[in-house]
A protein has these predicted regions:
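Active-site loop-to-helix "anion-binding N-cap" substructures in soluble metabolic enzymes
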Residues: 1-154
Length: 154
């Protein structure tokens, strides 16, 4: 039965000229039919260079949002609309705005694993591989790194 469903998805994907991107933590049945597998940033970069105009993002909401930001001309489908990342939901844009108003001397650095709304109110967005280099390049000493405290501590 699962194989039948996978076959139907593959058939529809071909008919619609779509591409399936899957985050590496997806289940094996999804990874088996994915065209590309990777982390959130890798998949966003892959999507940008694809010829297909329809991208099916098997991951969480911020990943689909990031794909759409980097490829605004593409149709991006998130199969499970309520798929969220607990880390991406740890802080709201309103909290960041309030913090920045109370502490204008701070620069707010957001990890890529955040919502589009949160990225929009931050000063810079980084990946795990670019975080250290970018933070070191910020002349201000006061930096709030959100939402990954482990990466921020590094």
């Amino acid at each position: 039965m699962l194989r039948d469903l996978q076959d139907e998805i593959i058939k529809l994907k071909q008919e619609k000229q779509a591409v399936i991107l899957a985050h590496s933590y997806q289940s094996a049945d999804i990874l088996e039919i994915a065209d590309y597998i990777g982390d959130s940033y890798q998949l966003s970069v892959v999507a940008k260079d694809l010829q297909q105009s329809t991208v099916i993002m098997c991951g969480v909401r911020f990943m689909a949002e990031t794909v759409k930001m980097l490829s605004p001309e593409k149709t991006v489908i998130l199969p499970v609309k309520q798929a969220t990342c607990p880390m991406a939901e740890q802080i709201s844009p309103e909290q960041v705005i309030s913090f920045k108003q109370a502490h204008p001397e701070f620069k707010v650095v957001a990890y890529i694993n955040t919502t589009t709304a949160l990225k929009a109110v931050c000063d810079v967005c980084v990946t795990s591989s670019s975080a250290l280099k970018i933070v070191k390049a910020i002349p201000e000493q006061n930096i709030l790194f959100i939402p990954d405290k482990n990466l921020g501590t590094y």
